[in-house]
Structures are given as structure tokens and as C-alpha cells.
């Protein structure tokens, strides 16, 4: 029996776009899903809540909602099961809850689970460190019309990578919106622009602009299946880890 077929993965948020993509990817790779729950309870399997799903699983993947985060983490803690959190739109209190849980169980918080985006983040960090603050940084992202949070979690991931490259905290140098704008762009800031429309799975562009030249580093997701494959890879990896807080760069060795 292979590791892929022996690790039982519980899926929270199974009815959503990512949940359906994970089910498709799991069937393609012969990965075992122990069950899945959605907004109305059981989606497949016989588990109506995260508590019963955690009991029957070796590791959990959560792509549900921020409102359900507390219950999902408590279920993982109760049964001492690793959990991957792909939910976006989290508050500072949510992040504190995740950090506390990571002292007792393995936790991955992933704004984006694709290999390409995480490689992009590594490149952005390196570029920001080498180019310096006299190069302006702007991050542009576009998603489908149904996405609620803006900027996207991935855009913020890329922003943090750029800020870390400069030895800064994103919260101190981010311009999340410029409407209305009455002053010129301030040197050293990182700007964000969010577009919403159609069925776009996820486009991200990081622009480094200086006098007379610019560098554009980008990633385009053509299907959610890339995120699903990354999430499953992370779940199999996390099942073997000790308690702690991890990121996708740890899974991918970046």
C-alpha cells in the first residue's frame, strides 16, 4: 500500500470550488478521502461535522469559511490531527488561534497551495532584496466575480514576500487602496490593485518599476486543479510532521 492510498484525508468545505477540485485531484492520484463536509453537513461519507470527520481522518484540509475556523481547529486539536488551512479572509484573532493550535498539532496556513505561486513568492522576495526601495512595487490580482476578499490571500502572500525582502513588515508599508487619491505615490510603499470578474481562477502580477524600466513577475492559474494537487501534497507531507506552524515553502523545500 502506498502512502497516497493509506493516509486518510478529511475535506472541510467539500461543496465549494476548491473542495470539488480536491475531490477530482484525489481521484486522479489514488489518494484516499475519508469524507467531506460542506455548509449543510455531509457531502460524502457519513460525517456531519468537523468533529466526527476529524476522528475518522489522519489529516484535515480546510477550505471552508473564516466563520467555521474555530470549530474546525477545535476538532483537530481534540483528536490531535494535523490540519491545512486554505481559508482566506482571516482576522488577526484567527491568526492568533492558528498560532496557538500549532503549539500542539502540525498546522499549515496556506494562502495558495500551488507550486508556481510559491516559487513566484520566493523570486519576489529575492528581487525585492536586490533592487531596493527606490524600485516601486505594485501587486495586481484578478479573480472570479464571486470572490469576497480583496486583496486576495495570494496577493498578500506576495506582498509579504516583497516586504520581507526589504526587511520590512507588510502592514507598515502596504497601500491596500488608493481611492480617492490626492497625493503622489510614496517611495517605499507596496501598492495593491484587485480586479473581479468572470470565472478567473487567479491571476497575479508583481511589478517592480524604476525610472525607464520595469520588471514584471507573474503567475496565471488556468485551473483550480493546481491548487488541489498542492493541497493534497501538503496533506501527505503534514501527516509525518511534529507539532508546529508550517507554510507551503516548507512543503516544497523553497
UniProtKB/Swiss-Prot annotation:
Pfam families: DapB_C (PF05173), DapB_N (PF01113). Belongs to the DapB family. Coiled coil: none annotated. Its main location: cytoplasm. Its EC number is 1.17.1.8. The keyword rRNA-binding does not apply. Keywords: Amino-acid biosynthesis, Cytoplasm, Diaminopimelate biosynthesis, Lysine biosynthesis, NAD, NADP, Oxidoreductase. The active site is at residues 143, 147. InterPro entries: DapB_C (IPR022663), DapB_N (IPR000846), DapB_N_CS (IPR022664), DHDPR_bac (IPR023940), NAD(P)-bd_dom_sf (IPR036291). CDD domains: DHDPR_N. NAD(+) binds at residues 13-18, 86-88, 110-113. It catalyses: (S)-2,3,4,5-tetrahydrodipicolinate + NAD(+) + H2O = (2S,4S)-4-hydroxy-2,3,4,5-tetrahydrodipicolinate + NADH + H(+); (S)-2,3,4,5-tetrahydrodipicolinate + NADP(+) + H2O = (2S,4S)-4-hydroxy-2,3,4,5-tetrahydrodipicolinate + NADPH + H(+). Catalyzes the conversion of 4-hydroxy-tetrahydrodipicolinate (HTPA) to tetrahydrodipicolinate. GO terms for molecular function: 4-hydroxy-tetrahydrodipicolinate reductase; NAD binding; NADP binding; oxidoreductase activity, acting on CH or CH2 groups, NAD or NADP as acceptor. It is an enzyme of class 1 (oxidoreductase). (S)-2,3,4,5-tetrahydrodipicolinate binds at residues 144, 153-154. It is found in: Cytoplasm. GO terms for biological process: diaminopimelate biosynthetic process; lysine biosynthetic process via diaminopimelate. It comes from Zymomonas mobilis subsp. mobilis (strain ATCC 31821 / ZM4 / CP4). GO terms for cellular component: cytoplasm. This is 4-hydroxy-tetrahydrodipicolinate reductase.
Amino acid at each position: 500500500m502506498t502512502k497516497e492510498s493509506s493516509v486518510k484525508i478529511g475535506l472541510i468545505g467539500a461543496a465549494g470550488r476548491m473542495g470539488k477540485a480536491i475531490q477530482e485531484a484525489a481521484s486522479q492520484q489514488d489518494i484516499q478521502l475519508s469524507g467531506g463536509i460542506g455548509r449543510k453537513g455531509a457531502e460524502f461519507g457519513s460525517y456531519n461535522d468537523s468533529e466526527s470527520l476529524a476522528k475518522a481522518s489522519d489529516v484535515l484540509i480546510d477550505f471552508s469559511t473564516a466563520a467555521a475556523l474555530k470549530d474546525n481547529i477545535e476538532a483537530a486539536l481534540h483528536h490531535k490531527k494535523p490540519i491545512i488551512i486554505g481559508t482566506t479572509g482571516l482576522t488577526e484573532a484567527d491568526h492568533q488561534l492558528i498560532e496557538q493550535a500549532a503549539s500542539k498539532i502540525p498546522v499549515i496556513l496556506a494562502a495558495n497551495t500551488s507550486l508556481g505561486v510559491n516559487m513566484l513568492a520566493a523570486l519576489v522576495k529575492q528581487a525585492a532584496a536586490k533592487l531596493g526601495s527606490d524600485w516601486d512595487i505594485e501587486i495586481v490580482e484578478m479573480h472570479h466575480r464571486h470572490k469576497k476578499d480583496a486583496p486576495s490571500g495570494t496577493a498578500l502572500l506576495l506582498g509579504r514576500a516583497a516586504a520581507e525582502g526589504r526587511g520590512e513588515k507588510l502592514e507598515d508599508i502596504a497601500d491596500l487602496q488608493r481611492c480617492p487619491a490626492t497625493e503622489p505615490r510614496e517611495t517605499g510603499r507596496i501598492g495593491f490593485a484587485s480586479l473581479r470578474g468572470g470565472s478567473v481562477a487567479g491571476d497575479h502580477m508583481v511589478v517592480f518599476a524604476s525610472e525607464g524600466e520595469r520588471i514584471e513577475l507573474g503567475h496565471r492559474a488556468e485551473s483550480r486543479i493546481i491548487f488541489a494537487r498542492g493541497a493534497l501534497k501538503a496533506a501527505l507531507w503534514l501527516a509525518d510532521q511534529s507539532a508546529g506552524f508550517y507554510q507551503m515553502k516548507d512543503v516544497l523545500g523553497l
